[in-house]
């Protein structure tokens, strides 16, 4: 069967008609050298600082050093698959990550890719990872409490929604435990809020440079307690390249800002920023940027300040949302005057200082109440907590002062002895096991008992037993009181004080 000439011409005409005149233009460069996660690229004349570029095989990188004759690019992945002479394409986009409700309950890497094996992420939008912090006009003073469920923190170092409170201490002093308990504590409040988004608090936990097993344990705990429903975990583990560890906090913050900008509340936990600074130092030195103090680059302060300034309380015209930050810093042998610790202390609105000495004495959470402060103060406390917490802080401060002197003298007058006895019991009362956060009303009742002499006759070793018994009593027979305190926040005075005293008297009578 022969093909007719007319058919051939028709086919040719069809082909010509469908010929695309649009040529795809891609700006490309060539790899000059690659190693240690850094690629030097010739070309890419119009690349922006912080722009994503693409290597063969889909490996991504970010342009950081724009020099006269080459571009320094950090690689988000394994550099073993990249070789000299490879072409590098511009993507014309700054690093961005998925954001939205679809990320809740998921574990993602620093680029927002899922790493939990639960399938693709359904994101409602994409957000640029490193954006400018809100200005002065959209902000409002911090005035709503962000309950951690820890007696020592909520009573003496209150944290408000929109605050940045640093958790600082040596390794193995319970820094992550404080942050994790704070996440677990939100479950009660989120469940009680129902559909009221203005009361809920969503959590974003950023793990930087940690072991994968540690992150897996944490996620397992969150899933077991049902806390994963309102939590996103961003993980750049120890086996990930330094650029991923550098980027993870920015990506996590972009995910948290989705809630802040939609009139909701979110909590950011950066665990920990010391490792991000180390990753940034590694990148900077390999890019041949000049080193400064402790070999960190000169802009390591700006690295942390631009990250933490994004946590803010917005005013009503901007949706009244908030982003609270709990950055964690690891110190070496309690040295809080090192470079990174002093930087982050000066950026944040207070710090919770955890001491290994207290930890080994069995005082856990090992909060040093003398060195820990909250620069927001009582404006971030409920009225009930405010009315009982002032006294406990003062009594513990006096106790610490007296305890130092009491070592030298044996003959102490009655008032000093009473102060020491009360202080020892209050110190014991501030202890709290992990994974057992308490509600605001429960903490108020416990501290009221401690500061109003209910423990003075109880032996120090029995304080924990007294507290456990009191909690059981309040959760069963005193449930109406707790519910009333939760619903109607007011000063502990008048009728409320009488009601609390009645419950305490009823319990103390049977306690033996």
Swiss-Prot record:
GO molecular function per UniProt: ADP binding; ATP binding; proton-transporting ATP synthase activity, rotational mechanism
Keyword Acetylation: no
UniProt catalytic activity: ATP + H2O + 4 H(+)(in) = ADP + phosphate + 5 H(+)(out)
PROSITE patterns: ATPASE_ALPHA_BETA
Compartments reported by the entry: Cell inner membrane
Membrane topology field: Peripheral membrane protein
Positions bearing the site annotation: Required for activity: 372
Similarity comment text for this entry: Belongs to the ATPase alpha/beta chains family.
Role of this protein: Produces ATP from ADP in the presence of a proton gradient across the membrane. The alpha chain is a regulatory subunit.
Name of the protein described by the UniProt record: ATP synthase subunit alpha
Biological source species: Fuscovulum blasticum (Rhodobacter blasticus)
């Amino acid at each position: 069967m022969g093909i007719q000439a007319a058919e051939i011409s028709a086919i040719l005409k069809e082909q010509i008609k469908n010929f695309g005149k649009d040529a795809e233009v891609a700006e490309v460069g060539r790899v000059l050298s690659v190693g240690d996660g850094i690629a030097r690229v010739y070309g890419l004349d119009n690349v922006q600082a912080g722009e994503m570029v693409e290597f063969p095989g889909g490996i991504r990188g970010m342009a950081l050093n724009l020099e006269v004759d080459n571009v320094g690019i950090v690689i988000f992945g394994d550099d073993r698959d990249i070789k000299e002479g490879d072409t590098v394409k511009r993507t014309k986009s700054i690093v961005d990550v998925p954001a939205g409700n679809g990320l809740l309950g998921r574990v993602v890497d620093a680029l927002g890719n899922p790493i939990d094996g639960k399938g693709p992420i359904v994101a409602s939008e994409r957000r640029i990872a490193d954006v400018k912090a809100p200005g002065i006009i959209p902000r409002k003073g911090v005035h709503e409490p962000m309950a951690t469920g820890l007696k020592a923190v909520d009573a003496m170092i209150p944290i408000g929604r929109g605050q940045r409170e640093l958790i600082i201490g040596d390794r193995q002093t319970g820094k992550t435990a404080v942050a994790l308990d704070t996440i677990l504590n939100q479950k009660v409040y989120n469940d009680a809020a129902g559909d009221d988004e203005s009361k809920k608090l969503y959590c974003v936990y950023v793990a930087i440079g940690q072991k994968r097993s540690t992150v897996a344990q944490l996620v397992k705990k969150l899933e077991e307690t049902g806390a994963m429903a309102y939590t996103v975990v961003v993980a750049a583990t120890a086996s990930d390249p330094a650029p991923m560890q550098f980027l993870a906090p920015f990506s996590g913050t972009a995910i948290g800002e989705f809630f802040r900008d939609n009139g909701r509340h979110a909590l950011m936990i950066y665990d920990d920023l010391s490792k991000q600074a180390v990753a940034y130092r590694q990148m900077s030195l390999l890019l041949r940027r000049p080193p400064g103090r402790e070999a960190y680059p000169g802009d390591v302060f700006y690295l942390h300040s631009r990250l933490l300034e994004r946590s803010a309380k917005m005013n009503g015209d901007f949706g009244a949302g908030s982003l609270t930050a709990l950055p964690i810093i690891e110190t070496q042998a309690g040295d809080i005057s090192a470079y990174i610790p002093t930087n982050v202390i000066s950026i944040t609105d207070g710090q919770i200082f955890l001491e290994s000495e207290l930890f080994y004495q069995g005082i856990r959470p090992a909060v040093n109440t003398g060195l820990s402060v909250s620069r927001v103060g009582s404006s971030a406390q409920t009225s009930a907590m405010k009315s009982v917490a002032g006294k406990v802080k003062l009594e513990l401060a006096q106790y610490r002062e007296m305890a130092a002197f009491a070592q030298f003298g044996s003959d102490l007058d009655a008032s000093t002895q009473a102060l020491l006895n009360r202080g020892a019991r209050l110190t014991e009362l501030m202890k709290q096991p992990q994974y057992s956060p308490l509600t605001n009303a429960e903490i108020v009742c416990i501290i009221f008992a401690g500061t109003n002499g209910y423990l003075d006759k109880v032996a120090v070793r029995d304080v924990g037993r007294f507290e456990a018994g009191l909690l059981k009593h309040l959760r069963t027979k005193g449930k109406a009181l707790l519910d009333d305190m939760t619903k109607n926040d007011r000063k502990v005075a008048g009728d409320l004080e009488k009601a609390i005293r009645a419950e305490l008297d009823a319990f103390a009578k049977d306690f033996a």
